[in-house]
Amino acid sequence: MMRTGGIFLKKKTKTLLTVLAVPLGVGAVSGFLTQGSMDTFEKLKQPPLTPPGWVFPVVWTGLFVMMGTASYLIAVSPKTEKRKRALILYGVQLAVNFLWPIFFFNAGWYLCAFAWLVLLWYLVYLCTKGFADISRNAGYLMIPYLVWLTFAGYLNFFIFLLN
């Protein structure tokens, strides 16, 4: 009996580590691909309220951990069509999230990046609703992500206007 419990805990631990690794991995690869463009970004005219550069990786790491935790709460919930749709939306928004910094930093397509960010915000909103329908806590964990994307949209749009 205890042995079964140990295997169960190991499976849940493996699931948790996996769902945390996915968004952190997306962020790490995206960050690696855009690191050469940070000098260009720092030379741009910045809108008011732009935080210092060190804030971005700290906030994104926290957001990736929260969204990974939210996806864990969904992944361990009973298998339903709602759960499947929510996890598909989660995967799609992660893919869209991955491409935004490439459009913004590497390509310098500020207006395109803003439109992409609006799409990302909408997908995250739908994902948050889908998560909240299954687990209220999972939905709550996604709210800071929506708030940050709203702020990122402000920064993105005004960088487009100012540059």
Protein language model regions, located:
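Membrane-interface helix-boundary motifs at transmembrane edges
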Residues: 8-11, 75-84, 131-139
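Membrane-interface helix termini and inter-helical loops of multi-pass transporters
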Residues: 35-49, 161-162
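N-terminal membrane topogenic signal
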Residues: 6-20
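Terminal transmembrane helical module of multi-pass membrane proteins
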Residues: 134-163
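Membrane-interface helix caps and helix-loop-helix hairpins in membrane proteins
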Residues: 100-111, 159-163
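Alpha-helical transmembrane segments of multi-pass membrane proteins
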Residues: 23-39
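Membrane-interface loop-to-helix entry segments
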Residues: 51-65, 108-119
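Membrane-helix boundary connector in multi-pass membrane proteins
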Residues: 104-107, 125-139
